[in-house]
Each structure stands twice: as structure tokens, then as C-alpha cells.
């Protein structure tokens, strides 16, 4: 939406899941539609002299190729000061990450760090500069951070190395190994992290890692039959299942742990592929075989189970239902929805129309309202879970007489509900 200086653009409200009225803005480049950092353009209106703070770093030994402090497991260490004096040891290939936040006087908000730099012996091996993110790379941010750790702790470690399939242009590796540090000499390696904001406020953290030669256990052998590769087209097939993951959708090669659940009377087997959340960069295609005939194949779809049920779409062809998926950690099966959406609890008072509208299966596609035959807008109030029409903003004349209202709800499988009533306004 183009806006101009002095133009009235929004009214703050508090109908969402928020603590106070506020306005969300995204800055995009009009030429590329990249997300861009608003502070690059607004810093003349903001005062910020507060330095970012790093809380801890994480070491990521490469499986089969590196050790950190004698272990192949990832490990975190707190920054009790800006210059850590404890001894760390490493051998082979190790990646690093950092948990850091930025702050600003006059605000209680916790902000992201604009620039993060990792140096080894004075040479920059990795740098991230959060100035822009291409729209098509948005989900790659999951791979830049330690996504698995975030899911468990809600702490965001920014990795100072790039996964093989991560092409975020804001990540800059100064080494041929994507920012992975190679400890191949028995000596002291001097590491330094610098975190800075867009105003130039920065803080530097240092620690020393001693290269200590030691035997590195071999990497666990992986099942080639269960592998998906980040740099090629993948076709994963089992009886009753076809999964197609295109090149460029994975941050790294991943070994699936496929599981199938057979339920009596179900339309298909239920398939899962990974033991925890693993988001793809974009949509992959999944096809499941239908076990028995249904009255209306257009009502079939694929449902994913991952905390909440989600409709993954679906088209039926030659005994298979094909939908889409972008989460390896969910489970998938065929579902059938020929039940219309629910319209209930209609009320008219205080110049407002309210109605409860929902669909517990494929999901609500649309809700349209008409007063005296003319379309009126019903807005969803998230906190209350109802749809509301403010009559003073609608093309409805206040006559003190009866008006007719018609509501039409349609779900994602084309099932339709119609509600009609009268109200005085």
C-alpha cells in the first residue's frame, strides 16, 4: 500500500493477541519486495546509545569431523564477562553460534542484533548483516538460527556458519567451509564475537580455544534409503505414499525416520517422517493412497497433525489424494469433509452484528454478510473468536425499523451454510 507523508494510515486497536494497542509495519523494497530493516530509514527519528548484549555462545562440532571440549555434542557457555578466561579445547571442524539481543533506551522491547561478526586470530570467518531478506528466502531464517534449540527453550542462537542449503544473502562466510572453524594445529586459537546495531553501538566478546589433538569418533552410518538430499530432487516412496521434495527446499541432507500408523476404518495410513519439527523452505508434494471409495471425492483432503490439525489441500486422481506439506515433523493422512461450517450465536446490539463462525475439519474459507441484500464486512475478532460487523461503517441506513441479514459461510471443501435473520436498527 503506497503511503505519503502526513497521510492517516491506521487506527491502533487491541483485538489481537497483544498487551496494548500497537501497529505492525513491514518495510519492503518496491523493486525486489525484499524485507528491509526499517531502522536504516528511521534512525534519524530514534535515539539509541545502548550496546547489544551477548548472553552465551554455542559450539557445534561437525559429526565425525570435530570435537569441542572432548565431546561431539553441541554445548553452550555463558558470557560471564566480555573476555572469558576459562580454557576451551577443540580438534577438527567446529561451528559456532551466539545468543544475543539488542536494546534501546525508552523501550522495553527486545530487538534483534543487526550485525554479528566472528573472527579467528583476527580474521573474519563469518558475518551476518540483517539489512534485507528476500521474500522467497524468508523461511531460511529457521536454518540460520538453531531452530531445534529454539523449539525446546525459546532461546534464539544465531549460527555463525551457513547450512549447505541456506542461501540467505545476509550470511557471509569468510572461509571455504561456510564459516566452520578448522582446529588442525596444536596451538591457541583466539576467537572474538562482535555484535552491533544499526547505530554503530557494539560490544566485543573474546575467548581462547586450545587446539588439542584427539581421536574423533566416526559419524553414525545413515540409511541411504531414508535420505533426502538438499542439492537434488528427492522422490521418497513407500506402499501407499509418495513424497516429492524439490532441490533447494532443505537446509541440509536429512535422514528420515518414517513411521506409519494403520487405523481401522481410516481413509489412508497416517505417515510421519521425522521425530521433531523440521521445516522446509517451501512447499513439497505428498500423495497418499485412498483405502476405500467415498461418496464425493471432491471432499477429500490431506490433514497434517502437528499440535493443531491443518488442511494441506488435496486433489483426487486415480486412487490417490495429492496435497502439499512443508513440515517433516508433522504426520499426514487423508480426511473427508462433507459437513457445512457452523454459524451460531448471532446477535444484534449496540450498532453491531456478531456471529460465531467456524469449521472444525477442512477450515473456513470465507464468510460473507449481506444486509438488505447489500454486502457488509464482517471482521474477525481474534480475542473473542467472533465475527463483527460495525453497522455505522456499513452501507446500512439507521431507520429504527427491521432489516434483513444473510450470512454465507463456505469451508475449504466447498460445503456451504446459510443463516438468515431480522434485526432492528
What are these regions (language model features)?
Residues 26, 97-99, 285-289:
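Residues within well-ordered beta-strands of beta-sheet-rich folds
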Residues 225-229, 293-299, 304-365, 375:
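Proteolytic cleavage junctions
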Residues 90-95, 279-287, 346-354:
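Short coil/turn motif common to extracellular beta-sandwich-like domains
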Residues 216-217, 257-301:
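Proteolytic processing hotspots in large secreted/extracellular or virion-associated proteins
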Residues 1-70:
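Conserved, short, structured surface segments that act as functional micro-motifs
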Residues 83-89, 275-277, 342-348:
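Short beta-strand segments of immunoglobulin-like
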Amino acid at each position: 500500500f503506497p503511503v505519503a507523508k502526513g497521510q492517516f494510515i491506521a487506527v491502533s486497536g487491541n483485538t489481537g493477541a497483544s498487551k496494548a494497542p500497537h501497529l505492525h509495519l513491514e518495510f519492503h523494497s518496491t523493486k525486489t519486495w525484499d524485507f528491509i530493516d526499517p531502522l536504516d530509514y528511521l534512525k534519524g527519528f530514534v535515539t539509541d546509545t545502548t550496546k547489544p548484549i551477548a548472553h552465551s555462545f554455542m559450539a557445534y562440532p561437525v559429526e565425525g569431523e570435530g570435537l569441542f571440549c572432548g565431546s561431539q555434542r553441541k554445548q553452550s557457555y555463558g558470557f560471564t564477562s566480555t573476555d572469558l578466561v576459562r580454557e576451551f579445547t577443540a580438534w577438527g571442524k567446529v561451528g559456532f553460534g551466539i545468543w544475543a539481543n539488542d536494546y534501546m533506551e525508552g523501550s522495553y522491547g527486545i530487538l534483534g542484533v543487526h550485525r554479528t561478526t566472528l573472527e579467528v586470530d583476527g580474521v573474519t570467518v563469518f558475518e551476518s548483516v540483517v539489512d534485507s531478506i528476500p521474500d522467497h528466502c524468508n523461511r531460511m531464517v529457521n536454518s540460520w538460527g538453531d531452530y531445534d534449540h529454539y523449539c525446546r527453550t525459546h532461546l534464539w542462537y544465531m549460527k555463525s556458519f551457513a547450512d549447505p542449503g541456506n542461501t540467505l544473502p545476509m550470511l557471509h562466510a569468510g572461509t571455504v567451509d561456510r564459516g566452520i572453524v578448522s582446529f588442525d594445529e596444536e596451538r591457541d586459537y583466539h576467537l572474538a564475537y562482535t555484535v552491533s546495531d544499526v547505530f554503530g553501538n557494539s560490544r566485543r566478546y573474546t575467548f581462547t580455544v586450545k587446539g588439542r589433538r584427539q581421536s574423533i569418533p566416526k559419524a553414525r552410518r545413515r540409511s541411504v534409503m531414508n535420505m533426502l538430499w538438499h542439492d537434488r530432487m528427492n522422490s521418497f516412496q513407500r506402499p501407499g505414499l509418495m513424497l516429492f521434495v524439490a532441490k533447494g527446499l532443505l537446509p541440509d541432507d536429512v535422514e528420515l525416520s518414517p513411521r506409519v500408523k494403520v487405523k481401522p476404518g481410516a481413509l489412508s495410513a497416517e505417515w510421519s517422517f521425522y521425530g521433531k519439527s523440521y521445516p522446509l523452505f517451501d512447499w513439497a508434494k505428498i500423495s497418499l493412497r485412498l483405502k476405500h471409495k467415498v461418496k464425493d471425492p471432491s471432499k477429500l483432503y490431506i490433514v497434517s497433525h502437528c499440535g493443531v490439525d491443518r488442511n494441506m489441500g488435496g486433489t483426487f486422481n486415480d486412487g490417490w489424494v495429492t496435497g502439499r506439506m512443508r513440515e517433516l515433523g508433522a504426520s499426514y493422512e487423508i480426511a473427508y469433509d462433507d459437513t457445512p461450517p457452523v454459524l451460531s450465536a448471532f446477535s444484534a446490539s449496540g450498532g453491531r452484528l456478531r456471529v460465531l463462525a467456524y469449521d472444525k475439519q477442512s477450515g473456513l474459507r470465507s464468510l460473507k454478510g449481506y444486509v438488505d441484500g447489500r454486502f457488509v464486512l464482517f471482521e474477525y475478532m481474534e480475542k473473542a473468536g467472533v465475527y463483527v460487523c460495525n453497522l455505522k461503517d456499513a452501507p446500512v441506513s439507521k431507520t429504527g425499523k427491521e432489516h434483513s441479514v444473510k450470512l454465507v459461510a463456505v469451508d475449504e471443501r466447498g460445503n456451504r451454510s446459510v443463516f438468515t435473520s431480522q434485526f432492528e436498527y
